[in-house]
């Protein structure tokens, strides 16, 4: 079963003044929505900075709170708004889950190996870095791996090459390309025809007319 991380949240009052006070005390305004009635809470800034990374992108959090409506809810961190200059978190959206109902999430695709096409002069073009899947919250994959070792020039890896199991259902189209090895185009500078050909001789000047 997917591990859950305990995260403490506390009830909060709404309004700009209250939100500003929370941020001053190094807490972040947040809202819980989804499988529950929307609930306003606050969460420690330090915790959000820690968990707002790719490593915890689809992590399940078990909320701990003095507010009975929030305590025990299992959530995903759906989004974090950050200040454009200080990069401090300003607001958090928590998505509450029903553990018995499937949810759609994006899962990172990690490429493994070195494509043989690179030694043939090809260039690797990564088209998709994540795919969308639907599954039970407890079966959300941490990431997918895709081996590109056998890709020669002109070969491609598609979504259909990713293997899924359990309740996981691929939503991204099977025909979509994840990575492809393209041939490296050679630039040939063609010399202008005028420069390649000898200049045409100028016509001879007419002799002056004889004086009578």
Curated annotation (Swiss-Prot):
The UniProt record lists the keyword tRNA-binding: no
Keyword Metal-binding among UniProt keywords: no
A biological process from GO: translation
Keywords: Ribonucleoprotein, Ribosomal protein, RNA-binding, rRNA-binding
Sequence similarity: Belongs to the bacterial ribosomal protein bL25 family. CTC subfamily.
Subunit description: Part of the 50S ribosomal subunit; part of the 5S rRNA/L5/L18/L25 subcomplex. Contacts the 5S rRNA. Binds to the 5S rRNA independently of L5 and L18.
PANTHER family: RIBOSOMAL PROTEIN L25/GLN-TRNA SYNTHETASE, ANTI-CODON-BINDING DOMAIN-CONTAINING PROTEIN, RIBOSOMAL PROTEIN L25_GLN-TRNA SYNTHETASE, ANTI-CODON-BINDING DOMAIN-CONTAINING PROTEIN
Function: This is one of the proteins that binds to the 5S RNA in the ribosome where it forms part of the central protuberance.
Name recorded for this polypeptide: Large ribosomal subunit protein bL25
